[in-house]
Regions:
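Short, low-complexity intrinsically disordered segments enriched in A/P/G/S/L with frequent Arg
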Residues: 12-16, 20-21, 26, 30-33
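Active-site rim beta-loop-alpha module in soluble metabolic enzymes
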Residues: 216-278
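Gly/Ser-rich oxyanion-binding loop with an adjacent helix/lid
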Residues: 119-202
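Short beta-strand-to-turn element immediately C-terminal to the catalytic PLP-Schiff-base lysine
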Residues: 77, 187-198, 309-312, 350-351
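ATP-binding N-lobe of GHMP and related small-molecule kinases
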Residues: 37-135, 153, 157-159, 189-190, ...
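Short, conserved charged micro-motifs
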Residues: 82-85, 225, 315-321
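Glycine-rich, charge-dense phosphate/pyrophosphate-binding loop(s)
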Residues: 255-351
């Protein structure tokens, strides 16, 4: 929800931006703040940041896409008390800290305010978690993106979405120490995002076929990201690297050319999936039945336990989602199914 009028629009040059790595929010190539015309500040803003599927099989740490739901909501409003405060968190069963420096949304928002020289600005945040923790759906990234985006909107939108990337990255990194944009990028920008360099935050949005759908299933089991990363090999045979690079290139070409057959031939992970699948009960059966139901490809979302299938058309995606859900239910493992187009918008303001 936007509460207030508006005046002039931003006059911010939208040329290519380069970012440093984990710098605490430095921007390179951005227009100086004195050159930026911002919209009038708002009294309150509510934003929604969507779940994301990272890695997309063959794009480990360099490829991700956004889905329509679930996601997190953050409300930002002005306060007479100086500084940033988190005044409410819901949907977390008391797990998340309200201390700004220990909360992903708080870190992202604070890093942004520090960059803008506004640390004394009074801002309150409400965080409403509406997606499962440790799901492999980018929960930490969604909160970080929502925190940075909401505060940027509240103070008149001095920065573009792409310029918010390092601040959201700092927020997510505060949760697990990792620095990879395959969740934050698509959550912030929407669509399918390819990361050429995580250190430089050199990213590109990719087009995709209009009728490309995702079926995402989250089984109610817990996989610690730390465990999922430690299980991966430190060294990879050259033959596997060649296969993976070929699959990634094929997937990117298939998306750009809207070639569903090439997409299907390319959604194969020969590095992470063979090791991580053992952490997900019934993974093999779920993949087999998803492919039999018409999926283009099937793999693990992020570090898991969520799994995803890319499909041509909504009908196929719903059929695949139902089949995968059945496999987990028979285990028996409670699960949730999310069937969605690729979300082209990313984080956005909601009523």
């Amino acid at each position: 929800s936007l509460t207030a009028g508006h005046c002039g629009f931003r006059d911010l040059r939208e040329g290519p931006h380069k970012f440093t790595g984990p710098t605490g929010g430095k921007l390179l190539g951005a227009a100086p703040l004195r050159q930026i015309m911002v919209q009038e500040e708002l009294k309150e803003v509510r934003v929604f940041a969507p779940a994301t599927v990272a890695n997309v099989a063959c794009g480990y740490d360099v490829l991700g896409f956004a889905i329509e739901s679930p996601g997190d909501e953050v409300v930002a409003r002005h306060s007479l008390e100086p500084g940033l405060r988190i005044v409410q968190i819901s949907g977390d069963d008391g797990k998340l800290p309200t201390e700004v420096s220990e909360n992903t949304a708080g870190v992202a928002a604070q890093d942004l305010l520090r960059h803008l020289g506004m640390l004394d600005r009074g801002v309150e945040l409400e965080i409403h978690k509406k997606m499962p923790f440790g799901s492999g759906l980018g929960s930490s990234a969604a909160s970080a993106v929502a925190g940075a985006y909401a505060v940027n909107k509240l103070i008149g939108e001095p920065l573009t979405k792409k310029q918010l990337l390092p601040f959201a990255m700092a927020g997510e990194s505060s949760a697990d120490g990792a620095w990879h944009a395959d969740n934050v990028g698509p959550c912030l920008l929407g669509g399918i995002v390819f990361i050429r360099s995580n250190q430089e935050l050199d990213i590109a949005q990719l087009p995709g076929p209009e009728n490309l759908w995702a079926a995402v299933v989250h089984p109610d089991i817990e996989i610690l990201t730390k465990v999922a990363r430690e299980i991966l090999p430190r060294e990879v045979p050259l033959e596997n690297v060649t296969q993976q690079v070929g699959n990634l290139g094929g997937l990117l070409c298939g998306l750009i050319q809207e070639d569903y057959e090439l997409i299907s031939r390319s959604i194969h992970d020969v590095i992470a999936e063979p090791r991580r699948q053992k952490l997900i009960p019934e993974f093999y059966r779920a993949k087999r039945d998803a492919m039999a139901a018409g999926a283009l490809g099937f793999s693990i979302s992020g570090a898991g336990p969520s799994v995803f299938a890319l499909c041509e058309g909504e009908e196929t995606a719903r059929r695949v989602g139902a089949e995968v859900s059945r496999v987990f239910s028979e285990a028996p493992i409670e699960n949730q199914v999310y069937v969605s187009r690729i979300n082209p918008h990313g984080v956005h303001v909601v009523d």
